[in-house]
Amino acid sequence: MFSKLIRLFISVSFMICGSYSMAQQTISLAGEWNFAIDRQNEGISQKWFEKKLKDSVHLPGSMLQNHKGDKVSLQTKWTASIYDSSWYFSPRLAKFRSPDNLMFPFLLTPALHYVGVAWYQKEIIIPKSWQNSRINLFLERCHTGTTVWIDDQLIGTENSLVAPHEYDLSKVAAGKHMITIRIDNSLDVINVGQDSHSVTDHTQGNWNGIIGRMELQSVTKHFLDNIQLYPDIDSKIVTIKIPLHEKRSEIKQISLSAKSFNSPVQQNIPLQTITHPAIVNDTIVIQYSMGKNPLLWSEFHPALYNMHIQIKWNDGQQQQQSIRFGMRSFKVMGQQFSINGYTTFLRGTLENCVFPLTGYPPMDESEWERILRICKSYGLNHVRFHSYCPPKAAFEAADIVGIYLQPEGPSWANHSTSLGDGKPVDQYIFDETNRMEKYYGNHPSYCMLAYGNEPRGRHQVDYLTKFIHYWENKDARRVYTGASVAMSWPIVPDNQYMIKSGARGLTWNHQPESNSDYSKAINAFKVPYIAHELGQWCAFPDFKEISQYTGLYKAKNFEMFRDILSEQGMGNEAERFLMASGKLQVLCYKNEIEKSLRTPMNGGFQMLSLNDYAGQGTALVGVLNAFWNEKGYVNAKEFSRFCNSTVPLLKTKSFVYTNQQTFNGEVEMYHYSETDIKNANIYWRIKNKDGKIVKDGVFDKDILAGKNTFVGNIHFDLSSISSAQQLKIEVGIQGTNYNNDWNIWVFPTKLPHIDTSKIYYTTKLDTKTEVVLNSGGKVFLNVAGEVVKGNEIAQTFSPVFWNTSWFKMRPPHTLGFVINPDDAAFADFPTSYHSDMQWWQIINKSQVMHLEDFPLSFRPLVQPIDTWFLSRRLASVFEAKVGKGKIIVSSLHIPTDTTSINPAGRQLLYSLEKYMLSNQFNPKSSIDISLIKGLLTEPSKYIFSSYSNGSPDELKPKSQITK
């Protein structure tokens, strides 16, 4: 009885449909539905729409939410590319393949999985009062293709991943009916690419179902939809275009009025009534004045309006709609973008459709507002939706928050399809992006559009050129590019802006500095250049995060990585690995983002990404986790110091100096706001480790908006520094929260003399080494370049890129290192517990030692953090008791001559040798010398194999991308 009352309940409400709302009657279809799985795809031939389906589910929702589907197994055919097959074949991973407890390393794991056809069925009642109305079936987001029957009559088919599925039921008689919906989430009809974030199991999951609003709607039979508003901030006019479906003579009057919101300033724009509107190409065109001082929408002032439209027909029917819009202009201006005439710089992140609790994107505005406000708190003003388009709630939230969006067609036409070769996906992209314009085109946050991500196809350039021309001629409210691509993809010359990977990365094969920029990459083009997928620096998994997976997807990958770490005797090191690798990750993002900010005429960047990516082998590239929560090693306040609308920048040739040098730094101010900062006082100060200011100064400067401004030079003679120490340089604008800082290290050219005659320093494990140890002596064994066990493990100063599974163990393999800075061994070497710039020359491309034969409890002094897929026990420096003696073994770049250009390396050697001469040199672990010999003579027992010949595009020859 209760369900019947629900079905009969009719409410007068405001329906938000894309960018507009209309007064109407609705009947909610949420609730219990009959259900059946059609594994053999026989439902149409057997006329299931004429039968009552026996199972049941609750909608809105997915099959997974309703516990429907097949148990995940080794035979599960994921909608995803997997290039690392080691999990399926490696004997050491056999226990993770147990049918009772499968732990996939490649992606988050659902309990059930299903790709194919499923049927949904519900009894409905159409009121008699609706008979003279247009009746619409509205399904906000379906996954993927739907076919609808009312009783035994086929109504139609829809296939959209970006927009509501709507069906006209106006010819259906009043009374009781059975609605049957067939949903197919396979890629058989239209293959957008199995790794597209709109469908892939790497991200949201390839779900089957309907989410969001589900309802029957009754509106006037003359109802006019797809009303689009085109603001012109120069003329202060909004052009309203209303496509006609009925003859003009039937329209009696159109009334318009606008009211502002989301702004401290309130405006009510006067009513305008039109009785004879202009008609151009079967479209009513109305010019509506916004008054003398309309409020403009931007990241700084996201003022919005509701345009109330009332259409009256001669037969007495009327239509009322309230359309949200903003007065804004987002354009290309030379090599940069402009917002309302002001130069802007896009500081963006990808949003990859990772929602572990539900397995699909949120349909409520509040959750999207939470996510976008987090993005903004980290200094970002832009979001790219990788190969998918979010629901309307995301656009509404971005309107409120002030974020520039780049949704994309729902395709990564690669890895199972191609673009421009005549496949169904070619027309589908045009259809889908037109649907995006219809439902979301009025949102001011919708500023940019691309077909999707990194396509394959011999004719992709021709196709994307046509795509750009089509859209730039059709709708000038936003700007267009063909595709978001890396460097190996062919150039589309007619792009209004470029998204390429040339303006990203750190050149840390050479000494780190902060003078260089990406000018060479961006100056190759006359249009704005956005760095494609900047970052991708990994941190170690946060196993505390496992408890947050309380929904439909479980972090079995994290559980597997945790077990592997524990098997290696390092389970108690997980938190240290997370924090140390996280600090290195932030250091990389800081330096790469600052390099982007100091590039003149740069268009911006798109990080990959602010939060973690759940799939493709588990890409822990975010400073936030998959839930957009902090991991503990950086927060928004810290991150936004170097990523914001205004950022102090410091140019210098190095971060490591000797006390015979002078520190020279150039201060400039990145400032992309709407106003200049006149008579700014820019302070700088240099502090020692105790926080004492050793040098400071102030610059007085006008900071101009929309560019970088040179502020002044800092010079500091370092001769007064007699001992190795870390200094901090701070630069900020007085009276504001805009400040930034950098660490530099100063090492003495002349070190205090210590008598090292009691230490046998050697680069070979020779006979004398054993003699010294057996007689109770001390040995420093420098095995740099001589390591065999671990030679296959590549260490650089930079951490793992994306992850080693997706890229088939492409180097580097480590995530920085962890040490105890309070250990006496480092008493004379300034360091924290993690990698920092003073370690670059010491650690970069140095060998690691694989301690696979050492006791599980053995802990080195300098411990590289291995890729979490293997968690091998590694060392760069370790100490031990051997025989009657004691030894330190190092594989780092440590020079012995006093004239070396590696002052940090000399200082580290000094600190270690001084430690060896002290009473504190008392290693906890005793080992046999054979273990050390094994490091130099025996290869690792375990060598990784991917058991696969396939590879991602980045590992393929360029010629294969255009096939």
Q: Where does each model-flagged region fall?
A:
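Secreted/periplasmic carbohydrate-active enzymes, especially glycoside hydrolases
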Residues: 1-15, 21-385, 447-448, 464, ...
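Substrate-binding/catalytic cleft of secreted carbohydrate-active enzymes
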Residues: 382-624
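Catalytic beta-strand/loop cores that center a nucleophilic Ser/Cys/Thr
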Residues: 511, 785-789, 805-903, 920-962
